């Protein structure tokens, strides 16, 4: 009977070990596939709202990227293609100063 217990016990340990390894792989994959923190889309929207107060921008011309530099440093990179057009409020301000 002890011989049978030996084979069953080692099989259970191998199954548990295999399940643990698979779970670790899944968790590691999920961590790397996440594009960034949960607050990143709202942060992007807030930054764009502030910029829109001063300059007209096309949402298609905006890229936001979060890069990790080491374990403790993250870099948020925001690229915006600005048009050569004058802001809408620029004409209003010049007319008021002329009056």
Swiss-Prot record:
> Biological process GO terms, please?
cell division; regulation of division septum assembly
Asked whether the keyword Cell division is assigned, the reply is yes
**Which interval of the chain is the signal sequence?**
none
Which cysteine residues pair off into disulfide bonds? none
Gene3D superfamilies noted in UniProt:
Cell division topological specificity factor MinE
According to its UniProt record, which protein family does this protein belong to?
Answer: Belongs to the MinE family.
HAMAP family, per the entry: MinE
Q: What task does this protein carry out?
A: Prevents the cell division inhibition by proteins MinC and MinD at internal division sites while permitting inhibition at polar sites. This ensures cell division at the proper site by restricting the formation of a division septum at the midpoint of the long axis of the cell.
Protein name, UniProt field: Cell division topological specificity factor
Query: Which gene does this sequence derive from?
Result: minE
